[in-house]
């Protein structure tokens, strides 16, 4: 059976989403399927079942498929850092801090890791659905394109193009992407999916005719724009979240500092009909928020400095209403933060924190990566840790008066904790089952896509020939 590559004709075309959709449809047809992305660039990551670290997109895709997670799904992960540097995570572990030029110069040394992971999965599953990255036809970078060209050429994958019609220029992007692909890859293209169409789908009937007859590319389906508030991969995805504009019981503000990470911690709050969630990226008053949350951060001291320069730091110190903090945000609550090993900074650095917790944070060289059930806030909460910062007095969580915080991600996924926390702020809060919501949303979304896709053509194309 042939493997599949999902190529976007632009960034944010819907590759991550269509990867889990196609994979789940194949799985339901009795095929053993795994998602894969050779290289991802994201500050949003999760700890796998094997204790390694991969991008949130591949973790979420695996969750949809109900398969175990491991670094094999995403062998190379880049996390942006200070001054153009990035953390290079290979096979689940941080190996270096590099600038972009160094990374591309050393790219050939990373190809064996990509091959090892892909081939390990290929022994375990019938079909790998490999998500591409950005555009597959950046001509100046094609020899360095691990996620698109390298995988498609090396494993002769069948290719599905995904085009975002919402951006405009869909015909140029489809024709240009297809015709700029190397000839041997063009012959592997199954067809194109037109994504994010707004309005009556029949209005694109003529567009289908043009693509199929003039471009000679089969159209596998036209998908309407459908809000899907799960699996946020990056800042672009975050900006697209949709909440129903009905009357809310609670208004929660999340401080969206420049290096904010792990947006997915707030998916349960976005999904909650009783909560209005707002991301704060400017120095506005925090008084009208019932609760304020400090999220994770890739560069904690940098983001702490950002708080200090725009007046939010003083507002948080003086606030008497609830403050909740997660991971990097939790570290900001302490009195002092020390980075002697230059984990996040170019020089050994000490910074003054908010002083709301009576201890200090020291950044250790070895990152803590752990996935478990944690005894925090009077409950056993499933989640994961991913941090360098260490607190001797409060190694997992802190709770006193209006201040609560934890190193543990996914705490708001826990129905009992979320209900307990929000009901303490608003007695009228009822709560809901996020896991049930999530399952229903995923199934409904996949079914809506399946009805509009030429699944038969995809299944025929991946059979061994």
Swiss-Prot record:
Keywords: Cobalamin biosynthesis, Glutamine amidotransferase. The keyword Iron-sulfur does not apply. Residues 249-417 form the GATase cobBQ-type domain. InterPro entries: Class_I_gatase-like, CobQ/CobB/MinD/ParA_Nub-bd_dom, CobQ_GATase1, CobQ_N, CobQ_synth, GATase_3, P-loop_NTPase. The gene is cobQ. This is Cobyric acid synthase. One of its GO terms (biological process) is cobalamin biosynthetic process. Belongs to the CobB/CobQ family. CobQ subfamily. The lineage of its organism: Bacteria, Pseudomonadati, Pseudomonadota, Gammaproteobacteria, Moraxellales. Pathway: Cofactor biosynthesis; adenosylcobalamin biosynthesis. GO terms for molecular function: ABC-type vitamin B12 transporter activity; catalytic activity. It comes from Acinetobacter baylyi (strain ATCC 33305 / BD413 / ADP1). Catalyzes amidations at positions B, D, E, and G on adenosylcobyrinic A,C-diamide. NH(2) groups are provided by glutamine, and one molecule of ATP is hydrogenolyzed for each amidation. It comes from the Bacteria. The active site is at 327 (nucleophile), 409.
